[in-house]
UniProtKB/Swiss-Prot annotation:
Fe cation binds at residues 176, 178, 310. GO terms for molecular function: 2-oxoglutarate-dependent dioxygenase activity; metal ion binding. Belongs to the clavaminate synthase family. SUPFAM superfamilies: Clavaminate synthase-like (SSF51197). This is L-lysine 4-hydroxylase. Its cofactor is Fe(2+). Being totally regio- and stereoselective, this enzyme is of interest for biocatalytic purposes to produce chiral scaffolds that are of synthetic value in the preparation of more complex functionalized chiral molecules such as natural products and analogs. Alpha-ketoglutarate-dependent dioxygenase that in vitro catalyzes the regio- and stereoselective hydroxylation of L-lysine, leading to (4R)-4-hydroxy-L-lysine. To a lesser extent, can also use (3S)-3-hydroxy-L-lysine as substrate, producing the dihydroxylated product (3R,4R)-3,4-hydroxy-L-lysine. Cannot use D-lysine or L-ornithine as substrate. InterPro entries: TauD-like_sf.
């Protein structure tokens, strides 16, 4: 395997670009007026529809998004939905989007299975409006929690602390695009931080941060790579279908990537050529990871899942630093929502009776609905 120094010698370090290579997400400072509008809208929708999964609400979601969201936020998201350009990082941080009532939220549950979704209802409405403005439609995946609804609470679980999952905490969660093992993975993701008292940085990596596609990246268009299921699955399958890591436009590609499962999983079953290519790519990509942002309560990170991978740093759940000492605190709690821009294109993969329920198991294989 080539050394990092040899790799760097082969890649042009300085090129003249007609655009600014994006290395960090756009940060939108939400105004107090916009925050107040969103709070009132969430309460209004909760009163009118009871649940953010109400079919009458979901089927008219795009209309409500453009009617009720603050205009500036709706315009930002609408542009974001079709911007695949060279200078688009693929993630937006809405700083201070919501005021989270910590007393109403109560103590963080032990795990996501114990989450009280009656306390999260208002946040589900607001997150869904953001997706609706793209416009994109909130969906759930059988491959994740056997569905579990369109809003998932992500909570550190002591029993899963060392895993490469959202429930983990004690190890760095390698950057990954959500559900890289699916052909019909989510198009857009939202991460609403209800609390992050441990001050855990969010890690982001954009395929656009490389600048132009180089020789290392060109090899990733070949459909020779294993995309194993993630650490939520117990079985180890190393002879699954193959796929490319980069896809779409050859000059401005999309990415399907999970460093933990494709490179560091000893049972991934990559061929020597595939593993070599992935490792060379990772040596370059890991230097482009952005870990500068520490989310606060009420912040939302909105991600194009075809452009930008996400992860997080390791942390000690329920412990924060204060005056140089670790003291107890409420554990981190986040809400994730996923969406697809078209239900037509995924119909062969969705439940017969619910086009919002994606039944894909692994790179085009569908779970048995019987």
């Amino acid at each position: 395997m080539k050394s990092q120094s040899l790799i760097e010698d082969e890649i042009p370090v300085k090129e003249n670009y007609a655009y600014q290579i994006p290395t960090s997400p756009l940060i939108v400072e939400v105004t107090p007026q916009e925050r107040n509008i969103l709070s009132n809208v969430g309460a209004l929708l909760e009163k009118a529809f009871k649940s953010y999964e109400n079919p009458d609400y979901i089927e008219a979601l795009h209309l409500y998004s453009f009617q009720l969201l603050p205009e500036r936020i709706a315009r930002i998201l609408s542009r974001f939905g079709t911007d695949f350009s060279a200078d688009q990082y693929g993630a937006i941080i809405f700083r201070g989007l919501l005021e989270v009532d910590q007393d109403h939220l109560g103590p963080t549950p032990a795990n996501w299975q114990s989450a009280d979704y009656s306390k999260l209802n208002k946040y589900g409405f607001i997150c869904s409006l953001l997706h609706g403005a793209v416009p994109s439609k909130p969906v759930q995946y059988y491959a994740q929690r056997k569905g579990g609804g369109i809003l998932h609470a992500v909570i550190p679980d002591e029993k899963m602390a060392a895993t490469q999952t959202g429930s983990g905490s004690k190890t760095n969660l390698y950057v990954h695009t959500e559900d890289a093992f699916l052909l019909h993975q989510a198009d857009f993701l939202s991460f609403l931080y209800l609390r992050n008292e441990e001050r855990v940085p969010s890690t982001l990596y954009s395929v656009r941060s490389h600048g132009k596609v180089n020789k290392i990246m060109e090899k990733l268009f070949d459909p020779i790579y294993q995309c194993p299921k993630d650490a939520n699955y117990q079985e180890e399958i190393n002879d699954g279908p193959l796929a490319s890591v980069l896809y779409g436009n050859k000059k401005l590609p999309f990415i399907r990537f999970d460093a933990a499962e494709q490179i560091f999983n000893e049972n991934a079953g990559q061929t020597p050529e595939a593993l070599y290519n992935l490792t060379e790519f990772w040596n370059e990509a890991k230097e482009l990871i952005n870990s500068d942002y520490i989310p606060d309560s009420g912040d939302v990170i909105f991600v194009n899942n075809h452009l930008c991978a996400h992860g997080r740093s390791a942390f000690t759940a329920g412990q924060k630093e204060e005056n140089g000492k670790l003291v107890p605190c409420e554990r981190r709690q986040m809400l994730r929502m996923m969406s697809k821009t078209s239900l037509i294109h995924i119909r062969s993969m969705t439940h017969t009776d619910d086009p919002y329920f994606v039944m894909e198991e692994h790179l085009g294989k569908v779970f048995d609905q019987a």
